[in-house]
Amino acid sequence: MRKLFGTDGVRGKANMHPMTAEMALRIGAAVGRYFRRENDTVHRVVIGKDTRLSGYMFENALTAGLTSTGMNVLLLGPVPTPAVGLMTRSMRADLGVMISASHNPAEDNGIKFFGPDGYKLSDEVELELEALIEAGVEPAQAQNIGRAKRIDDARFRYGERVKSSLPRDMRLDGLKVVIDCANGAAHRAAPEILWELGADVIPVGVSPDGLNINRGCGSTQPAAAAETVVAHGADVGICLDGDADRVVVIDETGTVADGDQLMALLASAWSADGRLSGGALVATVMSNLGLERFLNERGIGLERTGVGDRYVVERMRQGGFNLGGEQSGHIVMSDYATTGDGLMAGLHFLAEMVRRGQKASELARQFEPVPQLLKNVRFEAGQAPLEADQVQTAIAEAEKQLNGRGRLLIRKSGTEPLIRVMAESEDPVLLNRAVDDVVAAVEAATQ
């Protein structure tokens, strides 16, 4: 069982375990040793980050650890997470590292890894890394210590890759687009790419100060962007999160469309064009029941996975699927990217607007979501509330009541000490009762 790694790398509050400079140094050394263990020649790693203040500290600590084991480090600076996957492959690196806590507040940070193929590491590799981190590793000989070098054009390389995923003749001339970059990693790249495609760009969340990432902006807080869309009479809004691997879309009325709606649009469009590999979409257990029904009506399959875009990608690779994602806005288009890419997904939504000549509001609501209720229960370290008898009894009773009229999902968060209790049903009484009963049982088990 992994102790250090969660569903998306190592994450926590900066300067608190495990996100300390000392731990980042140990992680860098362990990862460096792991990825050059076959021989003693010098290898290469790329490191990207978002705009958090603590990113400087972790960038330097990781660089020290990696170079101490003989890895040459290529520093990309602030770039979207998908750019790290791209650059790992294009720079022929042995490893890619992204320093980010994604949509979390500025005081948090995280470290996630990409293998030489540009894909996130498997659970098995992370277990091996944890053992090395705990045990410590021997440094390289003095003559084999690595070097560090800055790569100044990473965001431009990323921009060209994103644009290459679109039809060659697609232009956004005359389209007024609000782009909310969450004061994060895409604050320069996203507006530039939209401008290059011909859009009239209205930027929001493009003034990072190290402390304002995801604060009152971005995909998890799209209200300000929605107000901007309406106030400026914009055609559409695109909201990214801090590391730009998530997206939500805002139509011209200020209504927000989540990842499920975007996946529904792309899946139906790709299926109609014969581009949907495997005839199915890959999504997590959190995706709405309404999405499943929408796809079924169109003869499109739905493959569900655990929560986390890495598990979506794993299933896509196993089954030969090329479209997947999460309700939260991670959209993975594996013909073009190795991980969720919020900007790329947003641009493909714009491409559908242009191709069909339709408003955002005509495309952003593909299906009527089944009412969904989600509640979180915090627990303390060492507690295992889901194993308690009263919790298991409450779950069984709730599932019995929902049978055929909805669904219930209970899971432990992979990034926080939370138990997430979610249910879906058109019956509001049944919906609330199912969630409340399970939540009460979990809370009792944590006392």
Swiss-Prot record:
Domain of life, source organism: Bacteria
Binding residues annotated for Mg(2+), in chain numbering: S102, D241, D243, D245
Q: Where is the active site?
A: S102
Isomerase as UniProt keyword: yes
Cofactor: how and how many bound? Binds 1 Mg(2+) ion per subunit.
EC id: 5.4.2.10
Give the transmembrane ranges: none
Matching SUPFAM superfamilies: Phosphoglucomutase, C-terminal domain (SSF55957), Phosphoglucomutase, first 3 domains (SSF53738)
What family does this chain come from, according to its entry?
A: Belongs to the phosphohexose mutase family.
Name assigned to this protein: Phosphoglucosamine mutase
Organism of derivation: Ruegeria sp. (strain TM1040)
